Amino acid sequence: GQGRRKALRELASRLDGLYVPQFYQPGYDKKGRLKSFEPVEGLPQSVKRMSVPTGKAADRHTIVLTPNTEFGDKFLIEIGSGCSRGCRFCAAGFIYRPPRPWPEEIINSVIAGAGDIDKVGLVGVEIADAGAIERICKHLITHGKEVSFSSLRADCLTPELLATLKTAGLKTVTIAPDAGSERLRRVINKGLDEKTIVEATERLAQWDILNLKLYFMIGLPTEEREDVEAIVHLTKKIKHHILKICRDKRRMGTITLSVNCFVPKPWTPFQWVAMDDLESLQDKAKIIKNGLRHEGNVRTTFDVPKWAYVQALLARGDRRVGSFLEAALKTGSWKKAYKEVDLNPDFFVSRERDRDELFPWDFIGHGINKDYLWEEYQKALKAEKTIPCQVGICKRCGVC
């Protein structure tokens, strides 16, 4: 009723970070593109994105542990927010700027709160400070905990960190090359060359961490067949180098490829890009499957393109996408939902955006300059590098 509306209106006008959709009115042009997004009743044009202050970092951990869930037996601890690297596909790396590693003393106090839980997972977009990670791992070992990571940077595997990981009994490490070719890694601003990646996997094997998981994406902007084939070539090269070490140890681990379809995300330099079509993604997956079919000790897992399409629809659409959600719930099928709703989902998923197009997420105040994201997109098309964030020094993106 009117009482509830008035209360929401009052809260939205006073509290940063509060978005009430009914108080913002979208307008569309003849082509169906968003042309305006206006607040009503005097509310701010932009809704500020709230960030976690360092003092609240102690709250960034698993609160409820329940069985029969993905991490039901593992206590997850966030070790920082944001990332300095600037990978152009990564939403978390941009929307959580500036990068903020949590103080070690706070993380150690959270570890103490894990109680009798044996397994601890360290989570973060950027796990880069090898010295800090080494000390945190030693603290976990001292308290009798098993440790795992979301992934580790190939250029951060120091001998000291590797020795600590071995002591911790780690059997598997995940590294994310993300693209197979040097060129495409420059496009996405990954900042890792092939030599660094291969040498990192060799060092892991030398320290008896023999199981390796590699993250790759297909469908990245400017990707050609040669870039997809490079995933196969890089995997074979890594295996060849590891095999020489494993022969001396008389045991071989497993290399597992996790291959996901690239989905263009809001607030990244690739927010203007059209998603690759499903048939193309399926063909690229086949290239990798066939290329590694006869490689022993190499396993491949693939994202399902049709579900990546759903993810892109939800990520890139505006409030009209709610009609697809309702139809999918009613029919029990996304395929039926696409037919039932009088909108073409390709409009949101497969359409390249115009330079000055208004996006449904532009009203969120992340502090990032949209022109900066466009400049990064243009640098991507030229495969040009951007240096990592220099917090408090550089002013390039507008956040600091």
Question: What is each model feature region?
Answer:
Residues 363, 382-400:
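C-terminal amphipathic alpha-helical interaction region
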Residues 19, 57-59, 65-66, 75-82, ...:
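Structured core elements
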Residues 108-256:
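Conserved SAM/AdoMet-binding glycine-rich loop
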Residues 130-136, 162, 222-231, 266-277, ...:
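Short glycine/threonine-rich loop-to-helix capping motif typified by GTGT followed
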Residues 1-38, 266-318, 325-333:
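Glycine-rich beta-alpha loop elements in corrinoid/cobalamin-binding modules
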Residues 10-22, 125-130, 152-157, 217-219, ...:
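A glycine-rich phosphate-binding loop feature that marks nucleotide/adenosyl-phosphate handling sites
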Residues 72-76, 88-97, 117-123, 180-187, ...:
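Glycine- and acidic
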Residues 1-105, 324-330, 334-364, 368-379:
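Acidic, low-complexity intrinsically disordered segments
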